Amino acid sequence: MNSTLAIAKPRIAVPVIALFLYAIASGYLMSVIPLALPQYGLDHSLASWVASAFYAGLLIGAMMMEPLVNRIGHRFAFIASLLVFIFTIAVLVVFPVAAIWLAARLLAGISVAGIFVTVESWLLHGDEAGRAKRLGLYMGSLYGGAALGQLGVGVIGIEGMLPIATIIGLLMLAVFSLMFGHSDQPESGHSDSLSLKQISKLNQAALIGCIVSGLTLGAIYGLMPLELSNRGIDRENVGSLMALVILGGMAVQPMVPWLSKYLGRTLLMAMFSLLGVGALAMTFLQKDIATLAVNLFLLGMATFALYPIAINLACDKLETRYIVSATQVMLFSYSIGSVLGPVVADLSMGENNGLMSYLFLSLLATCIYMLIMSVKGRREVMMS
C-alpha cells in the first residue's frame, strides 16, 4: 500500500503544482481586466463582452481539445495551452483595441479549455475510489490559487506593467514545472470518444449542474468586481471580497467527497444551491460589509461545489477510456453557461442588487430542479 501511494503522489503532484501557479495568475488577471479597462482607454461596458468572449473560447476549446490531448499527451498539451495563454495576455498590453481584446480573450478561452481538459482527465484516470479526493485536490488547488491571485489587486494593484509581468512570470513558472518536474501520465491515444447516443445517456443532473456552474461562475468572475465597485467598495476591499468568494470554493472541496458518502450527488447539488440562495438573501437584507463578506464566502462554497459534484456524477461507473471525452462534454456544458452568464447577468447590472438577483434566481431554480431529480432517481431505484 505504501508503495502504491509513493507511485501515485508524483503522478498528480506536477499537474497540480502547475495548475496552482496558473490559478494564481488567472485569478489576478480576472480582476485586473474589468477594473483596468479605463487605463487602456476602453469603456467599462466592454467587461461583460470580454468575459463572454473568454467563455465562448472555452466553449470552442471544449469541442476540440480531446484529439490534441490524445495525440501529444497530457504534459505537452498542458504546456502548449499555457504558452498560448501567455501570448494572449501580451496581446492585451500591446494592442489596447476593443476588437483585438475580444479576439485575444476568445483565444485565451480556447487555451484554458486545454488546461482544464488536460488536468481533469489526468486526475480522473486511476482508481475510481480515489477519484473524488483527486478532484477535491484539483478544485482546491484551482480555487486556492485563484483566491491568492485576487489579493494581487490590493497588494500589487492594476496599474502599470507590474501586474502583467507578475502574471506572465507565474505562468512561466507553471510551464517550467511541467517541463522539468517528474511525473507519469495517462498514455497518449488511450481514450475513446463518446458517441452522441452515449452522451445523451449521461446523467442529466450532471449536465445541468455543469451548465449552472458556468452560468453562476462566469457571472461572478466577469461582473462581481464591478458589482462590488458599484456598491462603493474600495479597490483593495474588492480584491479581498473576491478572494473570500474563491476561498469559500476552496474550503468546500474537502467536504464534497465526505458528504458524497452519505448523500446522493443530485441531492448534494440541491443542498449547495439552497446554501447559495440563503447567502444571497442575506445580502439583500443586510448591507454592511461584514455581512457581505460572510455571505460571499458562503456563496463561493455553494457555486464552486457544483462543478466537481457534477463531473464526478457524470463519470460515475464510466469506463476509463471514455474519461477524456466525458470531461470534454462536461466542460462544454460548463462553457455554454459561462458564455450566457455574463451577458444575461449584465442585463440586470443597472438595478439594485442586479448581479445578486441574477445569482439568486439561478440557484433557486437549480435547487428546485435538483430536488425533483433526486426524488425521481430515488423512486426509480425503489421500483427497480
Segments predicted by a language model, with ranges:
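Helix-loop boundary and gating motifs at the non-cytosolic
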Residues: 6-55, 203-206, 218-231, 238
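A late C-terminal transmembrane helix in Major Facilitator Superfamily
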Residues: 320-351
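Helix-to-loop junctions at the C-terminal end of transmembrane segments
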Residues: 61-74, 157, 252-264, 349
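Structural signature of the two symmetry-related core transmembrane helices
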Residues: 76-90, 168, 267-281, 360
